[in-house]
Amino acid sequence: MSSKMAAQTAASTAAAPMGREQWSLLLLLSVLWGGSFLFVGIAIKELPPLTIVLVRVGLAATLLAPVLWMKGLALPATMAAWLPFVIMGALNNVIPFTLIAFGQQTVASGLASILNATTPLFTLIIAHIFTADEKLRSSRFAGVLIGIAGVGVLMGPEAIAGRTSSLLGMSLCLAGCISYGFAALWGRRLRSTP
């Protein structure tokens, strides 16, 4: 990427201050996303991991289809147009949901959510390696560490102890976080897509 393109990309992605609506949506997302670890932890006792992933993705697709229709958007018509979305769906949903569901067979929900809090850290590292305009700075790194510590404090020492957690289960959860990081990088390609 040329320095001119990097400068244009950085300028076009400069963040505007978040308003009440954005903060409300972020809070809703946090509740929904955070609650998923609890529900997966409950479901994993009765259902196989891939069934849980299928139900999550199928339910989301069913709920989002009317939103697509209400916004007047159409599904892509060609395989070439579908490909970027298939890649995004794999990186941001199928791969991490599958890895985390398998990981939660031996990892408590609280610990899984703390491990998931490492997603911004992996995203920073991936962006630093693969982009010209998203380099790792000490302030970003410190912010991520404070965020991870905050999640740990909120979840409590019992979640961190993870007495029944296996190294494989924790590694699967972390691999899911790495996939989320690559999804964020891939999502940069889809910025202009509604």
Regions found by a protein language model. Give the residues of each.
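Glycine-/small-residue-enriched transmembrane alpha-helix faces in small-molecule transporters
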Residues: 2-54, 102, 162-189
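Small-residue-rich packing faces within the transmembrane alpha-helices of Major Facilitator Superfamily
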Residues: 34, 58-62, 148, 181
